[in-house]
Amino acid sequence: MNTSLEQSGCYSNRETLLRCSDARRELELAIGGVLRAEQQIKDNLREVKAQIHSCISRHLECLRSREVWLNEQVDLIYQLKEETLQQQAQQLYWLMGQFNCLIHQLEYTQNKDLANQVSVCLERLGSLALKPEDSTVLLFEADTSALRQTITTFGSLKTIQIPEHLMAHASSSSIGPFLEKRGYIQVPEQKSASSGTAVSLSEWLLVSKPAIGLQAPYVPSTNPQDWLIPKQTSENSQTSARACSFFSDAWGNLKGLENWLLNSHQQEIAGKPSSSKCNSHCSTSSFSPEAEKAEDVELLDQDELDLSDWLVTPQEPCELEKPVDGSWETSEKFKLLFQVFREPYNVSDWLVKPDSCTNCQGNQPRGVEIENLGNLKCLNDHLEAKKSVSVPGATISDGWLAQNHQDTWKVEEVCKANEPCTSFAECVCDDNCEKEAMYKWLLKKGGKDKNGMPMEPKSEPEKHRESLTLWLCPSRNELTEQAKAPKAMAPARIADSFHVIKNSSLSEWLMGPTCKGGPKDVPNTEERAGKEMLQSSMATSWCPFNTADWVLPGKKVGSLSQFPSGEDKWLLRKKAQEAFLNSPLQEERNFRPDCYGLPAVCDLFACMQLKVDKEKWLYRTPLQM
């Protein structure tokens, strides 16, 4: 008994717990629905306010347009009345002039022939209207009470109860169109063009309406076909074709989208049903409801195809499909149609052209305010800048040179205007300051003054060349000093030098092998003694044979032994080694790399102690005797 009681108690507790859980779940769902409804009301509130503002603004604009139209009508009526009264006044003035002439003739003359003229004028006077032919009263009548009533009753707010299963899935922006398609909302007919939403409030309220029988509550359909978009019909296809007719007339028959795909994809899609419309994929600007329905049908037709059919794979090169049915004219037509979108253009053509100054030649003079001088630009500078930008053959190096260009002078130092210009392109002077500064700089570089006359001081390029030469070869300094000295050398001295060379024996020109390739067992003392003896012999017999006398004549240099020979000897050995290693003689006999060539020739030139430029000594033309 106790176990049965315990089981019944547990069962009752479990049932109570389930009921409480269900109740809590229902409350949570209800709270969620209330919160969603509150959010939807907020969204709908903003949308309704925007619609009210737009509608009122448009009708206010209509009232303003009506006001303008009425004013124009008043002006037109005034012009018509004025013309009528002017014509009547002209006739009266003319007739009054006739009577003035007759009165003057009757007073001063006794002519009886005027009776006919008087009778004619009196007849004309009887036929004319002496009162204004047109009325002078112009009134404005308006039914202000009706307008006020229309304004006060303009617009209304309506609400509708939406089913719960639609509230959970429909958003605030899509509730209206969705319910309209399903038949929940009856679209009210527009009463007039000025009041599109002016319908009574009773149509939106849930009140009992007189009917034959009670309307059955709404029951959702269980047939899936009722929830799908209906298939395209012939009527819809004709409607969409009419909507795209103007596009076809302008662009030609572009055919379906499948004609624009690759050949491989078209072969894959060949076995599948394609779109039955020719112009279904054309983008039109039609805002009619028929076009919207056609777009819905297009979406359905596109969904029937597989997604892989629309993807482009990199298996084949992307080439446009050949014209259908081999029609070459159709492809040419497409090229001509889309050629407009491929034409090149220059961005500078769209920019505002700056004004040119009136001082440039070939420009028509025109008035310029002094306040706008800062906005003017010289025509020549503008054309040069435009040419440099629009030249098609400009290379990357030209751009690099333009970026790294450094002006030789500053604008502030050269500009002659009262207020210095920011750049030479904005110069407002008669003569461009940049050109004048360039002219002076070129004259200065050429060693001339501002009048074009040569200047005595050394020009800057010569000074720069001299400093560069001194930095590259310090040994040339002595040669330069010799050149600066007074040039005095007797012809007899040159003749004596040639006489000594002619009478000398050939054995004096040869020397023993003392280079690296020679025997290494010679003591250092003997080598040093041989060099001293050679130098002493050169000091006695070879003194007239001075290399400086052959290159740049100058004063006689003292003993040749005072100059170091390490630099010249090393250079000569290095040149001889490079020349010998590059010659085919080294490959044939396979000499060692440390062999510098003929030892006697190397030591001969090394002992001569050449203290001048070797290139000048080799290439200088001989002296004319």
UniProtKB/Swiss-Prot annotation:
GO terms, biological process: intracellular iron ion homeostasis; protein targeting to lysosome; response to hormone
Chief location: cytoplasm
Tagged with keyword Ubl conjugation: yes
Single GO MF annotation: transcription coactivator activity
Phenotype of gene-disrupted mutants: Exhibits profound accumulation of iron in splenic macrophages, which are critical for the reutilization of iron from engulfed red blood cells. Hypersensitive to iron overload. When fed an iron-enriched diet (2 g/kg), mice die prematurely and show signs of liver damage. Ferritin accumulation in the liver, spleen and duodenum, increased levels of transferrin saturation, serum ferritin, and liver hepcidin, and decreased levels of duodenal ferroportin. Defective iron mobilization from ferritin storage, inducing anemia. Impaired ferritinophagy in embryonic fibroblasts.
InterPro entries: NCoA-4 (IPR039947), NCOA4_N (IPR022174)
Quaternary structure, from the entry: Interacts with the ferritin complex, an oligomeric structure composed of varying combinations of ferritin heavy chains and ferritin light chains. Interacts (via C-terminus) with ferritin heavy chain FTH1 (via 'Arg-23'); thereby targeting the iron-binding ferritin complex to autolysosomes following starvation or iron depletion. Interacts with ferritin light chain FTL. Interacts (via C-terminus) with ATG8-like proteins GABARAP and GABARAPL1; thereby mediating localization to autophagosomes and ferritinophagy. Interacts with MAP1LC3C/LC3C and GABARAPL2.
Described purpose of this protein according to its UniProt entry: Cargo receptor for the autophagic turnover of the iron-binding ferritin complex, playing a central role in iron homeostasis. Acts as an adapter for delivery of ferritin to lysosomes and autophagic degradation of ferritin, a process named ferritinophagy. Targets the iron-binding ferritin complex to autolysosomes following starvation or iron depletion. Ensures efficient erythropoiesis, possibly by regulating hemin-induced erythroid differentiation.
GO cellular component: autolysosome; autophagosome; chromosome; cytoplasmic vesicle; mitochondrion; nucleoplasm
Keyword terms: Chromosome, Cytoplasmic vesicle, Lysosome, Nucleus, Receptor, Ubl conjugation
Protein's cellular compartments: Cytoplasmic vesicle, Autophagosome; Autolysosome; Nucleus; Chromosome
Protein name from the UniProt record: Nuclear receptor coactivator 4
Region (Interaction with ferritin heavy chain FTH1): 394-533
Post-translational modification: NCOA4 levels may be regulated via HERC2-mediated ubiquitination leading to proteosomal degradation; HERC2 association is dependent on NCOA4 iron occupancy.
Pfam families xref list: ARA70
